[in-house]
Amino acid sequence: MTCRGSPLAPLLLFSLHGVAASLEVSESPGSVQVARGQTAVLPCTFTTSAALINLNVIWMVIPLSNANQPEQVILYQGGQMFDGAPRFHGRVGFTGTMPATNVSIFINNTQLSDTGTYQCLVNNLPDRGGRNIGVTGLTVLVPPSAPHCQIQGSQDIGSDVILLCSSEEGIPRPTYLWEKLDNTLKLPPTATQDQVQGTVTIRNISALSSGLYQCVASNAIGTSTCLLDLQVISPQPRSIGLIAGAIGTGAVIIIFCIALILGAFFYWRSKNKEEEEEEIPNEIREDDLPPKCSSSAKAFHMEISSSENNTLTSSNTYNSRYWSSNPKAHRNTESFGHFGDLRQSFSLHSGNASVPAIYANGSHLAPAPHKTLVVTANRGSSLPAVSRSNGSVSRKARPPPVPSLHTHSYTVSQATLERIGAVPVMVPAQSRAGSLV
């Protein structure tokens, strides 16, 4: 069977030509994993029936850290290569000589930031149609960095402690394994381990918990370790000196407090005593009245009251008529003046009466001259004197004393006062404040 002359021949030839002229990008083998710092190869191949004169290849990357900002890795167009993003300069190139149907690229000295999704876009005119995009994932693996180990909690015996282990870097995320570096390489029975978080909790630690512990951080491409020394602290007995010092300090504090309380008490007591002494009034005592004189003699009674000066004076005054020629002196007047318990006087006047002077003891004496016995208790004021003469009482104002050339004052002796019947009395004293004591 031949197709010559058949009207279907041109259509069949066009259909075959269209199939042969289509471009197809091969599927990628999947994700590529590479350790940091090594070279990664990203494959991309295609098929085409057209010449590679107009070949156009673009490699793009969608970074894992920022999927919204795709970046150009490398470009081949018109028989020339062009660099993409600045961070790929000098590290990226095609694995084969261009132009070719194998447009795979390599990335030297891979970095963690190179991780992402890479796309290969191929165009070769006049071929059209078909799938012209290839997708390849790149994962840059990072081994665990040196982990940091530490102890959390008190290391005193009986306490709970947590051993921590963590690495700052590691892709994929590392796992952590704790072990005790002894003969058994096993953790204490009371320990609980979390390999994902990298922690070990040891409860109720004892002396057997002490030792060297190791943490191993590992992932798909590497491992790293750290060591930790756990030393459980046993309770130390307190020294005798420390106990004695504490007791001595407490005793000093107690003695000081007692002394302070006693001092405050005595101060309060003395202060209250002074206030009580100031509030108690002075006691005033009065003397009893003198004993009564016998009926056969005239009584001579003298009272003295308190005054500002509290003075007791006696005077014996006489005048020139004492030496008169009259041999007889009669007692014709008896005067007794009581001046508000302040002044008393007893006087004998010479006269024509023949009655001799009689004293309290009943003896008769010779006619006496004119004598006056004055007992005064001075006050600031002068009041009228009360006198008694011949049974009549009269109040006269005492004239002021007039100095006389014939008047003399002298002190009466104790014997003279006793002879005339004077009675001794106690004179109250006076304080500076004016109150009697």
From Swiss-Prot:
The gene is IGSF11. Residues 23-136 form the Ig-like V-type domain. Glycans are attached at residue 102. The chain crosses the membrane at residues 242-262. It is a single-pass type I membrane protein. GO terms for cellular component: cell-cell junction; plasma membrane. It comes from Bos taurus. Pfam families: Ig_3 (PF13927), V-set (PF07686). Its main location: membrane. One of its GO terms (biological process) is cell-cell adhesion via plasma-membrane adhesion molecules. Residues 1-22 form the signal peptide. N-glycosylated. Residues 382-405 are annotated as: Disordered. Residues 144-234 form the Ig-like C2-type domain. This is Immunoglobulin superfamily member 11. Disulfide bonds join 44-120, 165-215. Functions as a cell adhesion molecule through homophilic interaction. Stimulates cell growth.
